[in-house]
Amino acid sequence: MDMREVYVVAGSFVGFQLFFSCVSPVLSSNFTQGYGKLPPNKLNDWNSRLVSTVHALIVGLFCLYILWYDDAVNEDPVWGDPNLVKLNVAITCGYLFYDLLLLACNWSTMGDVFFVCHHLAALYAYGYVLTRGVLPYFANFRLISELSTPFVNQRWFFEALAYPRTHQLVVANGIAMAVVFFLVRIAVMPPYWAKVFGIIYSPTFEKLGLAIQVAWIISCVCLDILNIIWMYKIARGCYKVITGKLKGRKADSKKTTCVNNHTD
């Protein structure tokens, strides 16, 4: 691994930690009235999710830029120049280390086995990208999934502030979350795996070596299984929110009808 990537990983780790400890509390208290009323355990969760949103926007938008404009990576997905991809992956690795430390320090209130599995699988695969510079296209492609994170976090923010599930903002965010999550984590699976199988049955795959082959395929399978599980949970939640909204409208309609038909 080049020293540039080491510095970026370390800087990312420290930067996100400072954002969690110093920046998020100030921003949240100034722009959100309900922030100061949250219990300590929810304050930590709030700050961590704001950091998560910032990371997702940085990495997700950088990922799209690389997909659109980095011809070297797009033309050679296995051995293309990984310069920009390694920078993006290094930012993500720093964030993942920060988040794992945060989960370990607050396991009783924030611990989640799925997130730990997700982070470890990602670090395992991204380690080869940083050290060997291989598979830049596929590493960057996986980061598209981060674009769904802001909507997931926003749902939690609404719940923490006690917004009713039938509130228009909650419903709109829930629908947007389900749609974006499906597009960037589920709908991309067929083209991604089509590209993967195109590489597997070529001499290029053999040149990678067994260790990289295993790291690449197993981590992708694990991440996609987790994404399918999360998609199922999100779809169920979105369905409940939409049906709850419809039931609320029907109830209001019945009340209005009863009032209009009332005679003294």
Curated annotation (Swiss-Prot):
Q: Where does the record place it?
A: Membrane
From which source organism is this entry?
Danio rerio (Zebrafish)
Q: Which GO terms describe its cellular component?
A: endoplasmic reticulum; membrane
Q: Which residues cross the membrane?
A: 6-26, 50-70, 84-104, 110-130, 169-189, 210-230
Does the keyword Transmembrane helix feature in the UniProt annotation?
yes
Its primary localisation, in coarse terms, equals membrane
User: Which family does the entry's similarity section mention?
Assistant: Belongs to the TLCD4 family.
Q: What is this protein called?
A: TLC domain-containing protein 4-B
